[in-house]
Amino acid sequence: QAAQPSAQPTLAQVAQTPAATQAPAATQAPAATQSAATPAAQPAQTAQAAQAASGVAATRTNQTFLSYTSPAGTTSQYHVYAEGVDFSKPVGVVFYFDGDYWRNDQSKVYDPSGELAQMAASAAAQNMLFVPVISPDANRYDAGVTWWEDMERNGEFFRSFASSFIAANGVDSSNVWTMGYSGGAEFITYELNTKPQTWRNGGGSIMVAGGGLDEGTPSAALKSQPMFWYANSNDGSGETYPQTWSARGAVEGGYNAYRNAGYTNASATVLNGSGHFDYNFSQILSNSLSKGKATAAPKVEQKAEQKTEQKSEQKQNTQRARTM
């Protein structure tokens, strides 16, 4: 796990944020079903062509435990939540990375009908697919299955998968979000957001109970994109493994590192929750996507104003040149 930052400045406390509750685990994941409101799947030839070109099949219904192998030979699985998404309109996507675990029953990614389904509903409300990705890590010893160990391999796998998925499903590449919890949040801030963004040209990042940065340089391409960190007030040292690691410390350190690197559309929120295992992920996702949309709107208007000012200035310069 990444080292805890040495300095932990105090963040503003959220006064009315209730303590989040853990969603109950489902005993068995249901088979994938198609919503009556979901448009019919693409014609077979179109879907097959998309799959052949990208290595990922176009998906219009909920699917679980699909496999993908990267060009480097790294293989893992993912889920797709597509119900409630209107494919006649621009479609975005949220890729989700869970925290560390030793047994499958310790991770949300092995319970597709539990909290993941609730998070998918939050994404669908913004017309976005929800895609939890399982770490390629096969080592269940030491730190367990993680995203932050062997990040170069995991990063190559995910960037390849994301590019293929976005192409196969016609996703708007300017509306691609990542969300990570604990070690999954560390993967975003240490790996994905410090490397070239060849797989997307817009979107945002959500880090829950993690997301530090004490080495590496944030990508300049993301400076205007939303980055939102969240930590429970009591999620400090002793809450998780290793005992010396503090999720809240990682949140504060990562937020400060990215802000100092020029990321102006960033925020860090301390929730009135308990410890490391008490987060309302669907609420955090819903709030973050809404906040990201709200903070992005003024920037578009500002750019339009800048273009108007530039045209006016160019016109004045032309008139001056003609006068001279």
Task: Tell where the protein language model's regions lie, with residue ranges.
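Gly/Ser-rich "nucleophile elbow"/oxyanion-hole loop immediately N-terminal to the catalytic nucleophile
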Residues: 85, 143-183
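Alpha-helical scaffolding within the catalytic cores
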Residues: 111-121, 193, 209-222, 249-253
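Primarily recognizes the serine-hydrolase "nucleophile elbow" in alpha/beta-hydrolase
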Residues: 167-170, 174-222
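Active-site machinery of serine-nucleophile hydrolases
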Residues: 91-93, 97-159
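Cell-envelope and extracellular/periplasmic
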Residues: 97-104, 166, 181, 188-193, ...
